[in-house]
C-alpha cells in the first residue's frame, strides 16, 4: 500500500517538529552573569545549531552559546560576545548581540522562505571551468543572484591549462561578453598557477564566497589559495564516468587567506535557486536589459516575439549579446517549470 502524500502544510509541521526535537537534545549550558567576563568583539566563523565558533580580536576561536533571540546568526556575522571565566562542558562563552550586516547571502527554502547562509560578504566568486562543461547559462544564473543580492561578482574561469591556443581564443571571446558589461573576469589554473597572483590580489582585504557547480575546481582552488596542509576543504575524486566532483563540505566556515582577505566556504551556494524571484527581478538581474525596462509597447511584454518590444529591438541592433538573451529566457522558463512542479505560488510564503 503506497504512502499518503503529505500536503505542504503537513510537511512544514513535520519539519518544524523535527527541528524542535533536535534543539531539545542539544547540550545547552546556562551561564550566570557572574560567570562571564567583559563584552568584546568577534566574528562568527562557523555555526552549529545553538552554538557558534567565535573568533576573538586576538585570533583565538571560542565555542559559544547563542542567545535565543539571535536565531538567524550565520557565518560572517560581527558579534558582541562574553567569555566565561572557565569552560563549561566545552563551551567558553556566549554571543550576546550582532552588529548590522552590510550584506547577507540568502537562498530560497521551500519550507522556511528565504534563509540567510552567510553575512557581510564583499564579493561572490563565480567559478566555472572548461571541463566538465563551460556553461554561460550557469554563470548568468549566478550573476542574476549577485545582482539581486547586491553583492559584487567576480567571474573566475578555471582549468585554462587544458585549452589549446585556438580554444583559448574562442573562450576568451566568450568572456568578452562579460567584460563588455564591466564584470571582472579572471582566467586561472590551480594546476599551473596561471592567474593565481591576480586572483589573490582580487581576494585581498575582502570577505569572499566561492560559487559554482561540482567539478569546476572550487575546492582545489581554495586549498591552493589557503595553503592548507592538515585542515583541508574536503573534495572527493572526480568520477571517471561523469567527470563531476563530489561536494563534501557540510557546514559554512570562514577561513583566512595567508595573503590577506577571508573566504566563507558554504555548501548553501550550490543551491542558488531563482524560483522565488519575479520575472521582473530576473530582467533587472541582466544589467544590460535595465535601460529598456518600461520602454516596450505593451506593459505585459514577454520580450519574446512581442510587437514593439524594446529588448528585442536592442537585440536586433546588436546592443545585447545573443547568448545572454537566450539564457535570460532559459532562466525564466526553468523558473516557471520549478514553480509548476513544486506547486509554488505567492500564497505559499
From Swiss-Prot:
GO terms for molecular function: GTP binding; GTPase activity; metal ion binding; rRNA binding. GTP binds at residues 158-161, 212-220. It is found in: Cytoplasm. The keyword Nucleotide-binding applies. It is an enzyme of class 3 (hydrolase). Its EC number is 3.6.1.-. GO terms for cellular component: cytoplasm. Keywords: Cytoplasm, GTP-binding, Hydrolase, Metal-binding, Nucleotide-binding, Ribosome biogenesis, RNA-binding, rRNA-binding, Zinc. InterPro entries: G_CP_dom (IPR030378), NA-bd_OB-fold (IPR012340), P-loop_NTPase (IPR027417), Ribosome_biogen_GTPase_RsgA (IPR004881), RsgA_GTPase_dom (IPR010914). Residues 1-11 have a biased composition (Basic residues). Residues 1-29 are annotated as: Disordered. Its cofactor is Zn(2+). Binds 1 zinc ion per subunit. Zn(2+) binds at residues 296, 301, 303, 309. It holds the Pfam family RsgA_GTPase. Its main location: cytoplasm. Residues 102-272 form the CP-type G domain. GO terms for biological process: ribosomal small subunit biogenesis. One of several proteins that assist in the late maturation steps of the functional core of the 30S ribosomal subunit. Helps release RbfA from mature subunits. May play a role in the assembly of ribosomal proteins into the subunit. Circularly permuted GTPase that catalyzes slow GTP hydrolysis, GTPase activity is stimulated by the 30S ribosomal subunit. Belongs to the TRAFAC class YlqF/YawG GTPase family. RsgA subfamily. Monomer. Associates with 30S ribosomal subunit, binds 16S rRNA. This is Small ribosomal subunit biogenesis GTPase RsgA. It comes from Pectobacterium carotovorum subsp. carotovorum (strain PC1).
Amino acid at each position: 500500500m503506497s504512502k499518503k502524500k503529505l500536503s505542504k502544510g503537513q510537511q512544514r509541521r513535520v519539519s518544524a517538529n523535527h527541528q524542535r526535537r533536535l534543539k531539545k537534545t542539544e547540550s545547552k549550558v546556562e551561564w550566570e552573569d557572574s560567570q562571564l567576563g567583559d563584552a568584546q568583539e568577534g566574528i562568527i566563523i562557523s555555526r552549529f545549531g545553538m552554538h557558534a565558533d567565535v573568533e576573538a580580536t586576538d585570533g583565538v576561536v571560542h565555542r559559544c552559546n547563542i542567545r535565543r533571540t539571535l536565531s538567524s546568526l550565520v557565518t560572517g556575522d560581527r558579534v558582541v560576545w562574553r567569555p566565561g571565566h572557565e569552560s563549561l562542558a566545552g563551551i567558553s562563552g556566549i554571543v550576546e548581540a550582532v552588529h548590522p550586516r552590510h550584506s547577507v547571502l540568502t537562498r530560497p527554502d521551500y519550507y522556511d522562505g528565504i534563509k540567510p547562509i552567510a553575512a557581510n560578504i564583499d564579493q561572490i566568486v563565480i567559478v566555472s571551468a572548461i571541463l566538465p562543461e563551460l556553461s554561460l547559462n550557469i554563470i548568468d544564473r549566478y550573476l542574476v543572484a549577485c545582482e539581486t543580492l547586491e553583492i559584487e561578482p567576480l567571474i573566475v574561469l578555471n582549468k585554462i591549462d587544458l585549452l589549446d591556443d585556438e580554444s583559448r581564443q574562442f573562450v576568451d571571446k566568450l568572456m568578452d561578453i562579460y567584460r563588455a558589461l564591466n564584470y571582472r573576469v579572471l582566467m586561472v589554473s590551480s594546476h599551473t598557477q596561471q592567474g593565481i597572483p591576480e586572483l589573490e590580489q582580487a581576494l585581498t582585504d575582502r570577505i569572499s564566497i566561492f560559487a559554482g557547480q561540482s567539478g569546476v575546481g572550487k575546492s582545489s582552488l581554495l586549498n591552493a589559495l589557503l595553503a592548507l596542509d592538515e585542515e583541508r576543504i574536503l573534495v572527493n575524486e572526480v568520477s571517471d564516468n561523469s567527470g563531476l566532483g563530489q561536494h563534501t563540505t557540510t557546514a559554512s566556515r570562514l577561513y583566512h587567506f595567508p595573503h590577506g582577505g577571508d573566504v566563507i566556504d558554504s555548501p548553501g551556494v550550490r543551491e542558488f535557486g531563482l524560483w522565488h524571484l519575479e520575472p521582473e527581478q530576473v530582467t533587472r538581474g541582466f544589467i544590460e536589459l535595465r535601460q529598456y525596462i518600461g520602454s516596450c509597447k505593451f506593459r505585459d511584454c514577454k520580450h519574446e516575439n512581442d510587437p514593439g518590444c524594446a529588448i528585442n529591438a536592442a537585440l536586433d541592433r546588436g546592443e545585447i549579446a545573443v547568448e545572454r538573451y537566450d539564457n535570460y529566457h532559459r532562466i525564466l522558463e526553468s523558473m516557471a517549470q520549478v514553480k509548476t512542479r513544486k506547486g509554488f505560488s505567492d500564497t505559499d510564503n
